Design a protein with these regions (language model features):
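Short, mixed-charge amphipathic alpha-helical segments
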Residues: 87-114, 202-207
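Charge-enriched, short contiguous segments at helix-coil
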Residues: 103-154
Length: 277
């Protein structure tokens, strides 16, 4: 009997998907049901649908500038969902620059082929109905591999785009954005100045229909001042230099010209815990 594999279990993310996957394999255990393989194949096919819906909600796909209502009814096609799951709202020009449109087309075809294979096994006919245990093992393995290929090709291609996108968004752009929002920081003292912003690393969190979220980690070099400048001149004030780690989430509006893209602050936290130790 085929059992759940580590790979397919690692691919599903939500509690619903995990429960559905468990029930998919429970179908195969019911030897009194002559439709047990068909039910298994159908359930895995539905799991692939939910997996894709999680990565590409229709409400987000329709907001992309590249979205076209091919059905005339506002319906999102499977091909469009796959594109969004991989590229978000990036334009075709941007995609071509990052990985090439031919690569996207090839991956999309591979994903669609995997879905077609899953669909094939959901049809009830003599070759799939009430089949032997050995046939169930063989066909179930094909179904599992089809799902794994479907999910992995989407994930791998998306990761490739993110990696190239991180290279394209320069450290200078991120650092400039952090300086522009540095006046939002309120740290400990009566007065303070940000002397230096050191970006340790940054990575793309997600690509949505109209923006890219980037997590930034680093340290702030800060001059802390208690009292006025006049107090300091009389020796009544105090100033110290400290560095504090920070984390921030920046939102880059999707734009082919990264030098002109609009940058917003989604989140900004400065860790001052060491000050109190």
């Amino acid at each position: 009997m085929v059992k759940t594999t580590g790979t397919i279990c690692d691919l599903v993310t939500t509690s619903f998907q995990k429960s559905l996957l468990e029930d998919c394999f429970d179908n195969l255990k019911d030897k009194n049901n002559r439709l047990r393989f068909n039910n298994f194949a159908y359930s895995i096919r539905e799991l692939s649908r939910h997996f894709l819906d999680t990565l590409a909600p229709e409400r987000d796909v329709v907001l992309c500038l590249w979205f076209l209502d091919e059905s005339g009814k506002g319906m999102v096609t499977r091909r469009q969902k796959i594109k969004y799951a991989i590229t978000g709202g990036l334009s075709d020009n941007e995609i071509d620059d990052l990985i090439g449109l031919e690569t996207l087309s090839k991956v999309t075809k591979e994903v669609l082929d995997s879905i077609d294979l899953l669909n094939k096994f959901t049809h009830i006919n003599q070759s799939t109905y009430n089949i032997s245990d050995s046939e169930i093992d063989k066909n179930s393995t094909l179904v599992i591999k089809a799902f794994e290929n479907f999910a992995n090709r989407i994930i791998e291609c998306r990761e490739s785009i993110i990696e190239k996108l991180e290279s394209k968004i320069s450290r200078e752009i991120v650092e400039k954005a952090m300086w522009e929002i540095s006046d939002k920081i309120d740290i400990l003292a009566t007065h303070h100045n940000i002397e230096e912003i050191n970006i340790r690393n940054y990575n793309v969190l997600c690509i949505s229909s109209n923006k890219i979220l980037i997590k930034v980690l680093g340290e702030l070099e800060v001059r802390l001042q208690w009292g006025s400048d006049k107090d300091l001149s009389y020796g009544d004030g105090c100033e110290l230099y400290e560095d504090f780690p920070f984390s921030s989430v920046l939102s880059f509006t999707i734009n082919e010209d990264w030098e002109k893209t609009k940058i917003m602050v989604e989140d900004y936290k400065v860790d001052t815990d060491k000050w109190y130790k």
